[in-house]
């Protein structure tokens, strides 16, 4: 040994005690998400989960996502409570479009210096998202990495696994000309297009917190948590033969709808069937954004699109409305003529 002072992990910027304090803070909210299939508790090297016994030929479906630069806006405005809901929503909504019931969720939280209060607020939001979607928060990773992030900045990612009966997978193969398209309303921009949103705020000089929009502020509209459609869709699947579901995320209408359409089919969207929520009108006007670019970047008030047969339209609308969703007939499926796009917005 020399006379040099002894270094610790904390001296290097990693506070193990803070990490342990975070685990203690979140234990109770994580426990509230537990499903009967989950074996063991927090703290193991891996999480164990059985497949529900009701499935005869279960197929596992997995997904991972983040919340993009919506997180930057949330950090700038010190609003950390709902961003965890966004994280879960982006993952579980991708699973439900294939008919999968979310089983469990894991999160990754990375930061340069762990702020226990902020992290606890984020994880509490993640737990709330898990409760809304019926999946268990079975674990995660909190990485304190000095020098990797500026100040108290952090990043989050989510990972979800679900299950679907093989015979009930929704993959778009049933879609045919004549099918109806049903829209489910979004809660706002959800978690996509925020780099453009932040650029619009910068160019317009608008302060999100003090700019009024309807009965609240622009900030409230922009940071409204992403709507989770899982329970409504799982219920609908039991009652209606769903041909396809598209999650309107990054890439908007033009990119996401074709992902679930068979070749030689075309989605025809009636733009007169709904009014854009005021936040999208504000963004278009403040940023002088073309209508084509709006549909390419944002959901414009449509979180999901569902394809069903014309005979099931009224049943679908009635069921979704009973589940608390705002749903309407937005268009139909037609044969795709040579040279035409797969999505037409009239």
From Swiss-Prot:
This is Phosphoribosylformylglycinamidine cyclo-ligase. One of its GO terms (molecular function) is phosphoribosylformylglycinamidine cyclo-ligase activity. Pathway: Purine metabolism; IMP biosynthesis via de novo pathway; 5-amino-1-(5-phospho-D-ribosyl)imidazole from N(2)-formyl-N(1)-(5-phospho-D-ribosyl)glycinamide: step 2/2. It comes from Proteus mirabilis (strain HI4320). Keywords: ATP-binding, Cytoplasm, Ligase, Nucleotide-binding, Purine biosynthesis. One of its GO terms (cellular component) is cytosol. It comes from the Bacteria. Its EC number is 6.3.3.1. NCBIfam families: purM. HAMAP family: AIRS (MF_00741). PANTHER family: TRIFUNCTIONAL PURINE BIOSYNTHETIC PROTEIN ADENOSINE-3, TRIFUNCTIONAL PURINE BIOSYNTHETIC PROTEIN ADENOSINE-3-RELATED. It catalyses: 2-formamido-N(1)-(5-O-phospho-beta-D-ribosyl)acetamidine + ATP = 5-amino-1-(5-phospho-beta-D-ribosyl)imidazole + ADP + phosphate + H(+). Gene3D superfamilies: PurM-like C-terminal domain, PurM-like, N-terminal domain.
């Amino acid at each position: 040994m020399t006379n040099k002072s002894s270094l610790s992990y904390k001296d290097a910027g990693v506070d193990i005690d803070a990490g342990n304090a975070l685990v203690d803070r979140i234990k109770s909210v994580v426990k509230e998400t537990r499903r009967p299939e989950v074996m063991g508790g927090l703290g193991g090297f891996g999480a164990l989960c059985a497949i529900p016994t009701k499935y005869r030929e279960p197929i596992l479906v997995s997904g991972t996502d983040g919340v993009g630069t919506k997180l930057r806006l949330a950090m700038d405005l010190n609003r950390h409570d709902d961003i965890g809901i966004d994280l879960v929503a982006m993952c579980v909504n991708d699973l439900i479009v294939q008919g999968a019931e979310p089983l469990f969720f894991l999160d990754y939280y990375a930061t340069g210096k762990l702020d226990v209060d902020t992290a606890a607020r984020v994880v509490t939001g993640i737990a709330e998202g898990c409760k809304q979607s019926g999946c268990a928060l079975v674990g995660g990773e909190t990485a304190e990495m000095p020098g990797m992030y500026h100040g108290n900045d952090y990043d989050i990612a989510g990972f979800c696994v679900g299950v679907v009966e093989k015979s009930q997978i929704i993959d778009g193969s049933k879609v045919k000309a004549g099918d109806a398209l049903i829209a489910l309303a979004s809660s706002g921009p959800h978690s996509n297009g925020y780099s453009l949103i932040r650029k619009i705020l910068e160019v317009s000089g608008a302060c999100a917190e003090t700019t009024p929009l309807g009965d609240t502020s622009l900030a409230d509209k922009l940071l409204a948590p992403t709507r989770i459609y899982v329970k409504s869709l799982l219920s609908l699947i039991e009652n209606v033969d769903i041909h396809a579901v598209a999650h309107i995320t990054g890439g908007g209408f033009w990119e996401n709808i074709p992902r679930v359409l068979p070749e030689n089919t075309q989605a025809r969207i009636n733009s007169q069937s709904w009014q854009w929520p005021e936040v999208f009108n504000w963004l278009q006007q403040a940023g002088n954004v073309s209508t084509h670019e709006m549909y390419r970047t944002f959901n414009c008030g449509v979180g999901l699109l569902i394809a069903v047969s014309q005979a099931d339209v009224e049943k679908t609308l009635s069921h979704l409305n009973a589940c608390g969703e705002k749903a309407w007939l937005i268009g139909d499926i037609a044969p795709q003529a040579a040279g035409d796009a797969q999505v037409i917005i009239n």
